[in-house]
Amino acid sequence: MASPDVEYRCFVGGLAWATDERSLETAFSQFGELVDSKIINDRETGRSRGFGFVTFKDEKSMKDAIEGMNGQDLDGRSITVNEAQSRGSGAGGGGRGGGGGYRGGGGYGGGGGGYGGGRREGGGYSGGGGGYSSRGGGGGGYGGGGRRDGGGYGGGEGGGYGGGGGGGW
């Protein structure tokens, strides 16, 4: 399955609750043509989970956006912008440090868990394979991860979005 599904997608974290897809699109469109902008909402409450994705038409625009927007203020909050790997690409455990973040293993919708879990002991947004921006972190994940004791926002060994340990969200 070597389809040319190359996506130039950025993960955008630390979003203000008030940030909507239109303001996300406005902030990032200065770097190039956007294919998509999406804010992830909680399934039950419909409220923003504080992160989203923007997809560019070309790689240069994506890299310029990461360089230009990471650490910048958007709607009163300092945001984090990283390259996101497509959910369908890469063989498990790949990426830097293996098994964490958006470069393989866990990540949003990847690994053994994905959005909403799916493992016997928990799951959460990134299952048992690492947090949203963890590079090599195991365990944790946004909503807990596949361990009863791990979890928290980034959980596990290698960090993650906001640190480790201490119960699920």
Swiss-Prot record:
What keywords appear on the UniProt entry? Nucleus, RNA-binding
Subcellular location field: Nucleus
GO cellular component terms?
A: nucleus
Give one GO biological process term: RNA metabolic process
Q: Where in the numbering of this chain does the RRM domain appear?
A: 8-86
Q: Which SMART domains match?
A: RRM
- Chain segments carrying region Disordered: 69-100, 125-169
Concerning InterPro entries, the annotation shows: Nucleotide-bd_a/b_plait_sf (IPR012677), RBD_domain_sf (IPR035979), RRM2_NsCP33-like (IPR048289), RRM_dom (IPR000504), SLIRP/GR-RBP-like (IPR052462)
Residue spans with biased composition (Gly residues)?
89-100
CDD domains linked: RRM2_NsCP33_like (cd21608)
Functional note: May play a general role in circadian phenomena associated with meristematic tissue.
Write down what this protein is called: Glycine-rich RNA-binding protein GRP2A
* Source organism (scientific name): Sinapis alba
